[in-house]
Amino acid sequence: MKLLLLTLTVLLLLSQLTPGGTQRCWNLYGKCRYRCSKKERVYVYCINNKMCCVKPKYQPKERWWPF
């Protein structure tokens, strides 16, 4: 019974403490954050003034247009 009460308490606390998740950007390939991880790059900025951190494989390739 004590184990059940402890488990329910922990689950209740975890459901209250965990955020809903980060806002998604760049066609759901990026995440809006204040700092990007080492494997991510900033490509655009989100509406909430955070950086849209996108992994390099999901960013468009740069094309050089001849003039």
From Swiss-Prot:
Residues 1-20 form the signal peptide. Keywords: Antibiotic, Antimicrobial, Defensin, Disulfide bond, Secreted, Signal. The keyword Mitochondrion does not apply. Abundant expression in the male reproductive tract only. Abundant expressed in testis and the caput region of epididymis, but low in the corpus region. It is found in: Secreted. It comes from the Eukaryota. GO terms for cellular component: extracellular region. Has antibacterial activity. Belongs to the beta-defensin family. This is Beta-defensin 123. It comes from Homo sapiens.
